[in-house]
C-alpha cells in the first residue's frame, strides 16, 4: 500500500511566490446544530453521485474515483478493476450500509473543501449579481471561481465517526402518484472546524481583488446557507467564531 504523505509537509519551489500572490484568511467556525453527510454508501449509487457532482463521464476515470470514494468510506475494492467489477465486489457492503455519510481518513470525518468554494461562489453570486469585477469586467461568480481557493482538500470535523443518523422524510411524485420516502443521513452534532481562504492580489496595484469587507458579507451569508447535505432543511448552519488575516 502506498505510504500516506501529509500535504502540509510538502515544500514547493514556488511557495515564496505563492505567499506574495495571495492574502490568506483563516476562518474558524462552530456549527450551531447538525451537519449532514452527503456521500452515498451504496456502491451502485456512488457512480451516479460522482457523475452529478463532478461531471465525470469517462468510465475509466469514473471507476478510479468511485474506488477512491469507497476507500474513503472504508470499503476495500480491487485495484485496476472496472466500474462493474467494483460495484459487484462491493455488493455485500451495499447490503449492509444505507443512506449517506461522511468521507473519513486517519483524522476522522471530513467534508471536501470544494463544497466550501462552491458555497462561497454561491454567496458572491447572491450578494453581488449584476456587478462587474476586475479589469476584464467579469461576473462576480466567475471572478470568484478564478481568484479564490481553499487550502487543502479536506475540512475535518473533529469526529472519528458520525455522532448519529437522521431520517429524512420526503414525498416524490411518479406515474403512479405520490409516495413517501425515508432517507438516512449520518450527522456530526455541533462540530467546530476551520478552513483557509486564499484570495488573489491584483499585481497591477497590489490590492486584494475581493476586499475584507466583502469577505465579511460573503461569510455572513454562508453562515445561514450552510455546508453539507440537506442545507434546504436548514442543516449545516454555523457561526464564524474566528476570522484572521494571515498576511
Predicted feature residues:
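RNA-interacting cores
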Residues: 1-247
